[in-house]
Amino acid sequence: KQFTKCELSQVLKSMDGYKGVTLPEWICTIFHSSGYDTQTIVKNNGKTEYGLFQINNKMWCRDNQILPSRNICGISCNKFLDDDLTDDVMCAKKILDSEGIDYWLAHKPLCSEKLEQWLCEEL
């Protein structure tokens, strides 16, 4: 699914402030990671990254390409490509708990300031 900024803001409201990361920071980071498209798959340095949050198959999910995957989120990577973001959010929070927001490389250079443009006026 191709989300809009406002649709995504609505769905991800529960992440606002989690571990000190604001909703606009998440929206910006997701935009620069996957363009709000749940179907995004990127092959990167021998890993494959899936979905909105670009969660990789080496550490966080399994896809039978990398064996063994640590599969910390205990899930098939394909689950990050559907429209239900519940499992994506649960895994993203685990990543945040463990690695911090800078796990998402777009965050520091692109999403640490001037975040007004990432707010949804309708919320």
UniProtKB/Swiss-Prot annotation:
One cellular component (GO) term of this entry: extracellular region
Positions that bind Ca(2+): K79, D82, D84, D87, D88
Keyword Repeat included in the entry's annotation: no
One function term, GO molecular function aspect: calcium ion binding
Tissue specificity: Mammary gland specific. Secreted in milk.
Domain C-type lysozyme: 1-123
Subcellular location: Secreted
Superkingdom assignment: Eukaryota
Biological-process GO terms, alphabetical: defense response to Gram-negative bacterium; defense response to Gram-positive bacterium; lactose biosynthetic process
Function: Regulatory subunit of lactose synthase, changes the substrate specificity of galactosyltransferase in the mammary gland making glucose a good acceptor substrate for this enzyme. This enables LS to synthesize lactose, the major carbohydrate component of milk. In other tissues, galactosyltransferase transfers galactose onto the N-acetylglucosamine of the oligosaccharide chains in glycoproteins.
Quaternary structure, from the entry: Lactose synthase (LS) is a heterodimer of a catalytic component, beta1,4-galactosyltransferase (beta4Gal-T1) and a regulatory component, alpha-lactalbumin (LA).
Family: Belongs to the glycosyl hydrolase 22 family.
Record's protein name: Alpha-lactalbumin
The encoding gene: LALBA
